[in-house]
A protein has these predicted regions:
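Solvent-exposed loop/turn segments at secondary-structure junctions
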Residues: 20-26, 39-43, 62-64
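Hydrophobic/aromatic-lined pockets within catalytic cores
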Residues: 6, 57-61, 126
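Extracytoplasmic/secreted envelope proteins and their assembly/folding machinery
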Residues: 2, 33, 49, 53, ...
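Active-site recognition of the HExxH zinc-binding catalytic motif
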Residues: 46-60
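Metalloprotease/metallohydrolase-associated module, dominated by Zn2+-dependent proteases
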Residues: 42, 63-133
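Zn2+-dependent metallopeptidase catalytic core
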Residues: 1-13
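Catalytic zinc-binding patch centered on the HExxH motif and its immediate surroundings
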Residues: 12-33
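Short pre-active-site segment immediately N-terminal to the catalytic Zn-binding motif
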Residues: 32-49
Length: 133
């Protein structure tokens, strides 16, 4: 996951990966800690990429919420990136914590192209939030 972020973006952040038996699935916060619980179905690239997004500010900073209006991302970089991927009418949506498309919220989102797009979306969101690189 770190190699994917390094190859396709510039991110200045230290991540710590922990095994936490009390965590049901996986979780991460902006402080950089990514916690994975005992359920092996969450020990995968898709989940790690999703949690790295949280560690990088996705849904975990006040700046994230400031970019949303009625569940739609308003930042210029994020809007331009999603439109570059999916066309002029595309939008990035959020429930306040997670985003879609390309948020790696479910296993059916996994795949090389979507992994790349997730990293690019996170980079764009961070530019909009002013917390990059």
């Amino acid at each position: 996951v770190v190699a994917m972020f390094t190859r396709y973006g510039t991110f200045a952040k230290h991540l710590r990966v922990n095994y936490s038996p009390g965590v049901q699935t996986a979780q991460a916060g902006y402080g950089g800690d990514m916690d994975f619980g005992p359920k092996l179905e969450y020990h995968n690239f898709r989940t790690a990429l999703h949690e790295a997004g949280h560690a990088l500010g996705v849904g975990t900073t006040w700046q994230w919420g400031a970019q949303l209006s009625n569940g739609v991302w308003q930042g210029a970089a994020g809007r331009a990136q999603i439109k570059a991927f999916d066309g002029a009418g595309a939008e990035a949506y959020s429930d306040g914590t997670h985003y879609w498309p390309y948020g790696m919220n479910y296993n059916n989102e996994a795949g090389t192209v979507n992994f790349y797009r997730a990293v690019q979306m996170i980079a764009a969101f961070r530019r909009d939030m002013g917390i990059g690189p």
